Amino acid sequence: MRVTISMKSDNGMTATIKVGTYSTVLLAKDADGQILVDCEPFKSETCAKNALLKLSDNWTEINRVKSR
């Protein structure tokens, strides 16, 4: 099963975490739409979320979609 998580920070940054069976990738953009992190691989959803905390302190999950 795959999960796509959309997140937003207090300062306007957005992020998408894609969790698959064998990999987790992170895409993060600043408030102007400039890519900060482009498909960076991580071991887990938690590792990707911890990386987001280095960019901004407050992130909110706005959507979670599960697919097969």
Mark where each language-model region is.
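Short glycine-aromatic motifs
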Residues: 2-3, 12-13, 20, 57-67
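Local beta-strand/beta-hairpin segments that build beta-sheet-rich folds
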Residues: 4-6, 36
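Intrinsically disordered, low-complexity serine/threonine-rich segments
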Residues: 9-12, 17, 45-47
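Short aromatic-glycine-(Arg/Gly/Cys) micro-motifs in beta-strand/loop hairpins
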Residues: 14-36
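Mixed-charge, Lys/Arg-enriched low-complexity segments
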Residues: 34-68
